[in-house]
Swiss-Prot record:
Gene3D superfamilies to which the protein is assigned, alphabetical: P-loop containing nucleotide triphosphate hydrolases (3.40.50.300), Translation factors (2.40.30.10)
Function description: GTP hydrolase that promotes the GTP-dependent binding of aminoacyl-tRNA to the A-site of ribosomes during protein biosynthesis.
EC number: 3.6.5.3
Annotated protein name in UniProt: Elongation factor Tu
Region annotated G1, chain positions: 19-26
Reactions listed under catalytic activity: GTP + H2O = GDP + phosphate + H(+)
Domain of life: Bacteria
Native source species: Brucella anthropi (strain ATCC 49188 / DSM 6882 / CCUG 24695 / JCM 21032 / LMG 3331 / NBRC 15819 / NCTC 12168 / Alc 37) (Ochrobactrum anthropi)
Quaternary data: Monomer.
Gene it is expressed from: tuf1
Amino acid sequence: MAKSKFERTKPHVNIGTIGHVDHGKTSLTAAITKFFGEFKAYDQIDAAPEERARGITISTAHVEYETPNRHYAHVDCPGHADYVKNMITGAAQMDGAILVVSAADGPMPQTREHILLARQVGVPAIVVFLNKCDQVDDAELLELVELEVRELLSKYDFPGDEVPIIKGSALAALEDSSKELGEDAVRSLMAAVDDYIPTPERPIDQPFLMPIEDVFSISGRGTVVTGRVERGIVKVGEEVEIVGIKATAKTTVTGVEMFRKLLDQGQAGDNIGALIRGVGREDVERGQVLCKPGSVKPHTKFKAEAYILTKDEGGRHTPFFTNYRPQFYFRTTDVTGVVTLPEGTEMVMPGDNVAMDVTLIVPIAMEEKLRFAIREGGRTVGAGIVSSIIE
């Protein structure tokens, strides 16, 4: 049978389940596929395959389903460490998250940690599924748990008062034991997700940016920079900026080439060579970016959330302290930086995730949510994301 063509008629949204261990994330994922996709049983999702992202092995399960309005790619991770790694590396991008909280237990340590991580890595919106409501007879207790969840969300700068909270039971949905708590709740949940989680702006609609991978000099024509366009569109004749490492410079794109053919523009996803006017081969280097003027600024100091690899994952064997000086790999290049740990954190052990301040020795084109790897002599020892820029 011929493989069916992916119909891109509906907007596509990436989503994931987050929350404390055993609160029902995987059961809920299975229940959603039962009504909106090709049904995947709990054990099919739970046996998540391992993937590598930025040198780190992560187990994640991917399912897809659709509502009348949207197509969803949904990620579910079996273990807590996988969530931490997934959110920090961005292995599976999340445009929104479904926070699963057991009504029988209320918010637990990982509930808090996942909300904090969602805030740190810039997940735009959260919808809550209060699971296992069939185990709670007391309506007042349900209200109390809901209140606790809203307070916790507000504490981490999510709009706790507005976040939709759906009460139900993933198990009831899977076993058809209660339509109200089962199927109806799952359908209400997806209606809330459709409505509350914003459709992400497509990369092509964002301001142009291309990380520079290589620089060539072509006799009689000038300097060509190559790379994969990360977002936006660049047209021949447009003014662009070269940002990072050195002082920001302006130039004009006088030609765009792809697969040795001349084009009038390059767009998100294209691997292109851009001919730039009046710039010498020695004025540009790998690690800089070509971008729409004024869209990105160079920075050296930032706050980051990072995951440090364990020894078994090929990471460090020993802890590190304030003033640790590894390389930070941004887009296409390594830059040395100095780490300052937050007050009260004496040291960071392999396997920890940590909030830290970093000062780079040269500026890099940077914005919030930019991901990086932490390396020592070319070997990955951690992964991180810029949570806010200091200067």
